[in-house]
Design a protein with these regions (language model features):
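Basic, Lys/Arg- and aromatic-enriched nucleic-acid-binding interface segment
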Residues: 23-56
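C-terminal secondary-structure termini that scaffold catalytic or DNA-interacting sites
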Residues: 1-11, 19, 190-199
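Active-site/catalytic core of tyrosine-dependent DNA strand-transfer enzymes
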Residues: 28, 92-136
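Short, charged phosphate-coordinating catalytic segments
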Residues: 49-72, 158
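Active-site-proximal segment of tyrosine recombinases
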Residues: 58-59, 137, 147, 154-168, ...
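Conserved tyrosine-mediated DNA breakage-rejoining catalytic core shared by Y-recombinases
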Residues: 61-99
């Protein structure tokens, strides 16, 4: 089994020792139904956040020319990112990729932001979702959920780190800790005859 060695220096500083929250499968279904009812630009940006794991600010600053089709995969080119984490990443979720590409294809390519929406407005929609549904939610929770879902699918932690634009592998590990990992392949099978009490 391949392993990734994380040294103590890789772990993020000043992070409280508590488990990172992520959206449950039920909450994700509610979230998807909710954003499908938003206006096209808001709908597309939230699908992008869910399907790519990018930061809110990164999504808000994308131009139409930053979204490209490579083969049958949709990629976003993130520039001037936090901590110098510029990167070109795919939209992992198929439905998200189709929605974002359709939205982008219907727009005229110019120098304006792709979604014509500010970071503050996106966060405002997130607040409305939380108030309407009663689900504890903020935009960054989508990055946590993205990391957890990829980890559950067996994507290497170093790949998740690149997709999220993390400087530290330890930060990625912190995000991915809410993954529901199936440990059954690694569990020993005991011989019940050796442990059952005698009659």
């Amino acid at each position: 089994m391949d392993s990734v060695i994380i040294s103590p220096g890789d772990y993020p500083k000043n992070v409280k020792n508590r488990r990172i929250k992520r959206l449950t499968n039920e909450e994700l279904q509610i979230f998807k139904s909710y954003i499908d009812g938003l206006q096209p630009n808001a709908r597309a940006v939230f699908w992008l956040l869910y399907g790519s794991g990018c930061r809110v600010g990164e999504a808000a600053h994308l131009r139409a020319s930053d979204v490209t089709l490579r083969g049958k995969a949709v990629y976003i080119d993130i520039k001037d990112a936090k901590w110098g984490s510029d990167r070109c990443i795919p939209i992992i979720d198929k439905q998200a990729a189709e929605i974002v590409w359709k939205y982008r294809a219907e727009l005229e390519i110019d120098n304006r932001p792709l979604f014509r929406i500010s970071k503050r407005t996106i966060q405002g929609y997130a607040t409305q979702f939380a108030q309407t549904t009663g689900i504890s939610f903020h935009c960054h929770l989508l990055r946590h959920t993205f990391a957890a879902l990829l980890t559950e699918r067996g994507v290497p932690l170093t790949t998740v780190q690149y997709l999220l634009g993390h400087k530290s592998l330890g930060m990625t590990a912190h995000y991915a800790q809410s993954a529901l990992v199936d440990m059954s392949p690694f569990l020993p099978e005991i011989n019940l005859k050796n442990v059952e009490g005698e009659d």
